[in-house]
Amino acid sequence: MPTATPLDVSELIGCLGHGEISAVDVVREQIEHLRDVHEATNCVAAWNAAAESQAAALDARFAAGGPIGPLHGVPITVKDWIDVAGMPCTGGDIAHRDRVPTRDATVVARLHAAGAIVIAKTTVQVDSELWGSVRNPIDPTRSPGASSSGEAAAVGGGGSFLGIGSDSGGSLRVPAAWCGVATLKPSAGRVPITGHFPRVGERVDGRTQIGPLAASVGTLARVLGIIAGPDGVDAGVAPVPLADPAAVAVAGLRVGWFLGDDSFPTTPAIRNAINHAVQQLESLGALAGGAIDPRLDEALDITLRYWKRSSGRLEGWDVEAHLMDWDRYRSRMLRAHAGVDIVVMPVTLATAPLHRDMETSDYIFTMPASLTGAPAVVVPVGFDAQLPIAVQVVAHHWRDDIALRAAAAIEAAS
């Protein structure tokens, strides 16, 4: 099995931008790395046969002195729920195995315009009728997480510099935590989901957000600046300016925390990691804001009814009651978070379990930010028995910049 070491994109961008290495060479080498990771994890759903020719076109433009984008020549992978023109997009469903979109999803088009090159689509779900089981790059006997598991395995195994996945209830955050990579679930309404399959109104609604997975929080911030903003199609995306995380001062930030509760207890290693992260922020001048209760039992009840509604098993007055309870939960969380800027909390109850189907409790700590639409960053902070540990940094809606800056500070101290 290849060494499971996520690759940071910053140095690569510098080398490509200065002509020290060609995009073709980078793409060829990265495809070989990804093949090794795929052999170990089963993370690839489809390969892009045009990747080298796309890289050659970028090299020709660079040689001619033409403009290059901020991700010039960077090889990336994309979850097989997100359209890439000319490549299969099945959503992991055997009924759609022959579906090949003719246009890119908005986020993919923006990444292409920035110079990125899609080298592969990645598998979804832990187990799939189309592809079989996805394995964790750290330990193949362990689960890689939820539906963005192929992306997390590709990035966590060092097969991809940057992954693009999606998250409705934790599908970016749980795989990232278990595979040892950073990720961002952006604020609801920040990034268009045009070109996400299944479509809005089928099995996807306003909880679903597209976001990046990478080796570092800095790369997440770089990519968010590229993919965010209205596209004239997704009516759920608002023209809210994206503030620069680098402009956020950690000193003075009010930090809340949650360690778990009696109903959903976390392991000692995870509780210690959260306490350490909070202490690191306080050492930089952040202010202790106290413990925050995310009302997990309430979040679980609303989420379970959401799943029933999305599958047509909730009708009539029950649907209206569910939506009213969801609104009340959002209001309660606004009041609970009023005295803090961020909350540092667990991503999961424990480190990656032995390979199994996902359980509802695996998502318990990711449910609150999914229901409120708040931005949430997952940042790896260490290991317990050689398995990755991560913490989740949740900020107020639209304050992706604060979540990213605080997570970067935690990352730097880890």
Residue ranges and their predicted role:
Residues 1-53, 282-283:
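An N-terminal boundary/leader segment
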Residues 12-18, 95-99, 208-215, 393-394:
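Short, well-ordered beta-strand elements within core beta-sheets of diverse protein domains
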Residues 19, 30, 73, 79, ...:
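Glycine-rich, small-residue loops and helix-cap segments
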Residues 36, 156-256, 275-284, 371-414:
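Structural helix-boundary/capping segments
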Residues 37, 71-210, 260, 312-313, ...:
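Short glycine/serine-rich loop/turn segments
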Residues 51-56, 115-116:
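Long amphipathic alpha-helix in the N-terminal Rossmann-like dinucleotide-binding domain
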Residues 71-91, 249-258, 279-339, 380-390:
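Short helix-loop capping/hinge segments that flank enzyme active sites or metal/cofactor-binding pockets
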Residues 110, 152-154, 280, 367-370:
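Hydrophobic/aromatic ligand-binding patch that stacks against planar heteroaromatic rings
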